[in-house]
Amino acid sequence: AKIDKVSLDVVFAAQTAWQILLAAESCNNLSRFDGVKYGYRTAEYKNIDELYVKSRTEAFSFLTKATIIYGSDVLAKDKYESCYDKSLRIRRIVLTKVKELLVSYDAILTPACSRLTFEPYDTKDAFTKVFDESLYTAVASITGLPAMVTGGVQLIADAFNESTLLSIAHSVEKEEA
């Protein structure tokens, strides 16, 4: 196997764009979990508004609530173009750059996270911690290309090349054994 060190200068842009797109899409997708048709339903409520608020308050974690609020913010009329729309454009740029690399290589191998072990942290710090660690997986998340983590590394391949990923992952795991 031929392995080269390459540079992917769009990683930091991918991380920020991924965070914005994740929040916006989560905000929209989680809006259906109102306790009426989908999701957890609180036991006690006086009216429909209270059902929505209490069901979501009881069911969603701090991180989920923070993501929904952030998503609402980036989808707001005054920020839509500068945040959400710009992130969609960045997504296309990142995908183009990654596909250019994948013309010459079967896969891209990257770290999956910044460290081997994690210390417990307060849930109030979760949003920042998750954002910091997303640097390593943001490219795969934002491009929609097939990716997998094995042996502490992430492998990213071109569309419809999952068999290549599995073959490389098998080789990585054999090397670890």
Language model features with spans:
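Structural helix-boundary/capping segments
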Residues: 2, 32, 37-39, 66-96, ...
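Short, active-site-adjacent cap segments at secondary-structure transitions
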Residues: 11-13, 115-118
